[in-house]
């Protein structure tokens, strides 16, 4: 039997701000992270360095609740992990469609319904964890004439598609 493994090399990301909170005691890095993010613009990346126990799960829950995204986790640091966090959205969006937990073709079907509700030139954000979503969204874009502005994928495989009508 052969093990199926993926190697995730560190992407070429340039954070606008770095926040080193190694050694920080309770309540942990989230309050300091919130304060620092106030100085970061929408669509920019912050690098949080932390060795706080349980921070990875806390960050993912916090990011989902606050419309941020944990893009990548650098686990190669000598002390603590490096969390690359995208603040907010890359583009202004008129509507958000979150179909996380739904199987394909649900993302494209829901995006189609939402596009009917917005005007030409406006954007939607489609959030999906379906592994086939990138392929399906690209095919859908080509057949509908909409424009894919960007796609991001977080460290847990959740995609954000920014689509212009």
Give each language-model segment a name.
Residues 2-165:
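Domain-level signature for proteins that mediate thiol-based redox and metal-cofactor handling
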């Amino acid at each position: 039997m052969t093990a199926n493994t993926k190697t995730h090399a560190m992407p070429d990301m340039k954070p606008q701000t770095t926040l080193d909170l190694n050694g920080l005691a309770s309540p942990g890095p989230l309050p300091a992270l919130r304060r620092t993010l106030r100085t970061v613009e929408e669509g920019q990346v912050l690098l949080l360095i932390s060795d706080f126990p349980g921070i990875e799960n806390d960050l993912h829950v916090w990011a989902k609740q606050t419309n941020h995204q944990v893009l990548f986790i650098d686990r190669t640091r000598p002390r603590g992990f490096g969390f690359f966090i995208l603040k907010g959205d890359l583009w202004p969006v008129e509507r958000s469609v979150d179909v996380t937990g739904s199987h394909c073709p649900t993302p494209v079907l829901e995006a189609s319904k939402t596009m009917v509700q917005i005007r030409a030139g406006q954007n939607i954000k489609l959030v999906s964890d379906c592994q086939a979503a990138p392929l399906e969204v690209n095919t859908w874009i080509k057949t509908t004439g909409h424009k894919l502005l960007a796609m991001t994928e977080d460290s847990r495989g959740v995609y954000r598609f920014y689509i212009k009508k």
